[in-house]
Structure formats: C-alpha cells, structure tokens
Amino acid sequence: MRSENTALAARMPAQVDDLLAEVDTPALVIDLDRFERNLVAMTEAVRGNGVRLRPHAKSHKCPEIAKRQIAHGAIGICCQKVGEAEAFVAAGISDVLVTNEIVGAHKLARLAALARSAAIGVLVDDPGNVAELAAAVAHARSTLEVLVEIDVGAHRCGVAPGRSALELARAVASHAGAGLRFGGLHAYQGAAQHLRRPSERRAAIARAVECARDTRVLIESAGIACPTVTGAGTGTFVLERDSGVYTELQPGSYVFMDADYGRNELNSSDPVFAQSLYVWTTVMSAPAGDRAIVDAGLKAFSVDSGLPLVADRPELECTKASDEHGVLRVPSGAKNLRVGDKIRLVPGHCDPTVNLHDWLVGVRKGRVECVWPVSARGALL
C-alpha cells in the first residue's frame, strides 16, 4: 500500500504555490473563488426554508470538499457506492446516505460494518433486500437507516408510489428491533435535472411532489412515521425546496457545474452557480492553421453529455476526442494556437469527469493553493 501511495503522489500534477502555468497537464483544476461562491450560494438558497441540505458527493468524490460543504451547513452527504461511503467515513464524515440499492452478501456486510462507525442510510425497493439488510446488521450488531425509494418519473430504481411503497415501509418497520430504522422516502427525479425549459422542470417535479406527498400520507395513515422525504438535484432543487413535501435536498453538481448544466434555461429568481471546474490542457500539436491537438481526451473528460467547451476562447470548438487527444477547430480569422499553449476546457458532465482524475488542483489568482485527492474515485464496489 505504501508503494501505491508513493506512486500516486508521484503523479500529482502540481504542488502548492506553483503557478497555474506550471501545473502539469492534463489536470482537473478548480477556480477556488468561484467554488467558494457556489458553496455560499447554495447555503443561502436553502437557509430558512425548513429543509436540510445533504449534498451528493458523487459529483466530487473528495472528502476535503465534503468537509467544506458540512462547514457551510450541510448535515451530511450522499454517495452511490459502499466504497465511496467507506472513503468518506475514513476521512471523518460521520453522516452518509447511500442513495442506491446495495445487493450482494459482501457489500451488505461492509455496509453493516461501516454503520458501526458512522450514521449510515441506504435505499431499498425490494422486500428480499430488506431481509438481507436485516441479517447483515444483526451479524454486525449495527443499525442502518433505510429509506424506501419510489419511482417519481425517472424510471430507474424505485417501487411504484402508493401501496407498493407502503408494503415495503412495513417490511422495514418490522425489523425495528433488529437494527433497521425506517427513515422515510427517497424521491429523486434525475431525468428532470437537464430538462432545458423551466416549465418542463416544473411539470416534472410537480408530478414527483404529488407522488411523494400521497405516498407519505398513506404510510403515515398506516401508523408508520415518515420523517424524511429526500431527493432533488442542482437543476431542480428550488422546486423541491418550495414544495412543502421534501425535507432534504441532494444537489451535487452545484459546486462545479458543467457544460450541460450551462444549457439549462433559468428563471430570473433561480440561484446562479458559476463554472468552477476545468480540464487544464496543453496544445501538443498544431499541424494546420485550422486545427490544434490538446493532451486531454477521453481519459481526461467524459463525453456522455457532449464534448467539452473551450473556456477562454469560445470561438474554438472541440470537434472530437480519442483516448489521449482532443481536437480543436480553429476558425478562419481566429488567433492560431501554438504548441505549448494552455487551454481550459469545460467538461460536458462533471461527475464522471472527476472520476477520471486522482487529484483536484485548487487555484486562486493564478497560483495553486491546494491539491486534494479524489479519494472515492473508482469506488465501484
């Protein structure tokens, strides 16, 4: 393990006090001023509205960022995998909701063991999984908070709202003396986050709110307390915040933003979060006046939401990418790029882009202020 850590440190793209121009490429760079403004903007957007903030750490996978979110008022974090939860708990995060169904004896044993060290929550949408969780916590002598996931329109995981959710809540509550605690409902409408028009997002979240409200009423009318309704993302959290139904919000991308979120239309009253995350690259080849090649490709940025944008030269276009190359088109009349020039790219999707990097380089006023490990990257298990 020591040799692995030494090798990882040797791949650090920068050291504190380096100039930005000295940061090795490709690297993932954070504009710290913008990042910190985003933290404050989310705190102000949530404060005084009777809801809790539990940011989704799948976006950054970085304990240093999670600690800053908690310092700005978050009650804890969300993550998606047991391995991610383990990384955050090891770094001192004490309240983690795994917003996923966890299946398989080995993963369940790890999750139950982790719950001896921190407050851990998890989702279910299957009665058999409830029984497996109960067996795991009994063996580990721990306690898990369990939320029933309902499908509110994303058509991914989740039982149907209504009676199916009630039956699952009853199954969880039946194990109350054996280490499972029913925590409420998980009602995340992920598909709504990137609907471009505000009216589309409002309609999608209105349906989600109705599903969550009716299901909570049904569960509570059966004598089961339903203290939490959690969900929301960066694209819609204002709607869930104002719904009177959601008690907890899970935005994640707001700390960084990305090109795809930048395509969303906003209402004039919506909070504005600044682009703070960039892929820092170097022009490695300029074989023709209309074309330049940078040293960042598919192994440095995700393209599931489109190719990256060029931050400081909007007239340039990233036209394609291969494993280690990004191709930029230089239009006629634009200033040519030269070998060695540095370029900032805005990734199409921040979450999977972060997962490609070992380090986040924090920069302020052109100088490296911090280098943070992406401790939960690659935690697929």
Pin down the residues of each PLM region:
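C-terminal accessory subdomain/extension
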Residues: 287-381
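Alpha-helix-loop-beta-strand connector modules within alpha/beta enzyme cores
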Residues: 42-48, 62-63, 98-103, 125, ...
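Active-site loop/helix belt of alpha/beta enzymes
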Residues: 145, 151-266
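Conserved, mostly hydrophobic/aromatic
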Residues: 35, 58, 88, 148, ...
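Active-site-proximal beta-alpha core segment in soluble small-molecule metabolic enzymes
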Residues: 56-195
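Glycine-rich tight-turn/loop motif centered on a GG-T
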Residues: 20-32, 95-98, 112-122, 196-206, ...
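Active-site loop ensemble at the mouth of alpha/beta enzyme cores that anchors a bound cofactor
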Residues: 201-203, 236-314
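A charged N-terminal "starter" segment
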Residues: 1-113, 377-381
